[in-house]
């Protein structure tokens, strides 16, 4: 006799088919941990857009995208979501739609605001596995990093040179 499979089984099979390479690389327990992960990407520009897409393509189960900016034609050379048809649209909304087509099972939160002292809590007051900081401005970057350290939330920081003009003049300093 043929058993009727529930929708959960169908999604599980689709997920397995889509991300079987991740299980081969990290094992089933690693793949399951990635599927349960919730990562926030703050700043959906040249670094954040590529980071968010990599998370979706890795099978991360929930992604929160935070940025208030719209896509500009000048973003085309460095931002994965910057296409002729997306110019003028919200970065987080366009990115969420794109990620949904890559990983339909991923829960996506598109938060249309900049990270500030007032909005920091709304981002970090959720169960996060990690944060990717792709913020250009130094002040909100420092706020985010300090709060992630305080809360014990793993954070990867990257992005532009804090709005500086010459990123080739690298100095190593404490951001505090």
Please tell me what each predicted stretch does.
Residues 47-53, 73-74, 137-143:
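Short glycine/serine/threonine-rich phosphate/pyrophosphate-binding segments
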Residues 1-11:
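Single conserved hydrophobic/aromatic residue that forms the stacking wall/gate
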Residues 118-127:
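Short amphipathic alpha-helix with an adjacent loop that forms part of the alpha/beta core around
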Residues 35-56, 64-67:
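Glycine-rich adenosine-cofactor-binding loop
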Residues 65-103:
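Glycine-rich phosphate-binding loop and adjoining beta1-alpha1-beta2 segment
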Residues 128-176:
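E1/E1-like adenylate-forming module used to activate ubiquitin-like modifiers
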Residues 107-113:
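Conserved SAM-binding strand-loop segment of SAM-dependent methyltransferases
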Residues 9-40:
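N-terminal charged helix/coil linker that caps or initiates catalytic domains
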């Amino acid at each position: 006799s043929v058993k009727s499979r529930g929708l959960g089984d169908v999604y599980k099979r689709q997920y397995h088919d889509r991300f079987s390479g991740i299980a081969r690389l990290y094992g089933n327990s690693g793949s399951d941990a990635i599927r349960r992960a919730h990562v926030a990407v703050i700043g959906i520009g040249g670094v954040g857009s590529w980071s968010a897409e990599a998370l979706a393509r890795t099978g991360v189960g929930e992604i929160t995208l935070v940025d208030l900016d719209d896509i500009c034609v000048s973003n085309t050379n460095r931002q994965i979501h910057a296409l002729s048809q997306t110019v003028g649209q919200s970065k987080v909304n366009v990115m969420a739609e794109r990620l949904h087509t890559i990983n339909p099972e991923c829960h996506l939160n598109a938060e249309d605001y900049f990270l500030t002292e007032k909005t920091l809590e709304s981002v970090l007051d959720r169960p996060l596995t990690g944060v990717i900081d792709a913020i250009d401005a130094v002040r909100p970057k420092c706020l985010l990093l300090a709060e992630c350290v305080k809360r014990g939330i793993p954070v990867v920081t990257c992005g532009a040179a804090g709005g500086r003009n010459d990123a080739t003049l690298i100095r190593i300093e404490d951001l505090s």
